Amino acid sequence: MGEIAFGNKLWIEKNGQFFLGKGRVELLKAIDSFGSINAAAKSMQMSYKKAWKTIDDMNSLANEPLVIRTTGGSGGGGTSVTKAGKDAISLYERVNANCHSFLEDELKNEQS
């Protein structure tokens, strides 16, 4: 038998609806980095329309917005990830790391 490896895909649901997964976390992190939905979408080779719909879907499921937009003004507009958004990123990454560690431990136990 060849080398065995475990893999997993984690997602978080809220009220039975898809809320957060790897791609959405990457989008939130890109928005946080660029301060722009358009730049974040381009960096992920995603359309602006899809990025905005994804944000709207997450915001509508969250208890408070994960992303907020500001318009115009002397400094120009922009987009930012809120504390709730950053907390959601941290939750996903923590749970994903724990799942990965669990699977690695199980694999080690299986191979010993």
Model regions and ranges:
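Residues within the DNA-recognition helix of helix-turn-helix
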Residues: 54
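Central "turn" residue of the DNA-binding helix-turn-helix
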Residues: 45-47
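Alpha-helical linker/hinge and terminal dimerization helices associated
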Residues: 88-107
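Short, Lys/Arg-enriched N-terminal segment that forms or immediately precedes the first helix
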Residues: 2-16
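Residue cluster at the C-terminal edge of the helix-turn-helix DNA-binding motif
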Residues: 60-65
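Basic, amphipathic "hinge/linker" alpha-helix immediately C-terminal to the N-terminal HTH DNA-binding motif
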Residues: 69-92
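Short helix-boundary/capping micro-motifs
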Residues: 34-41
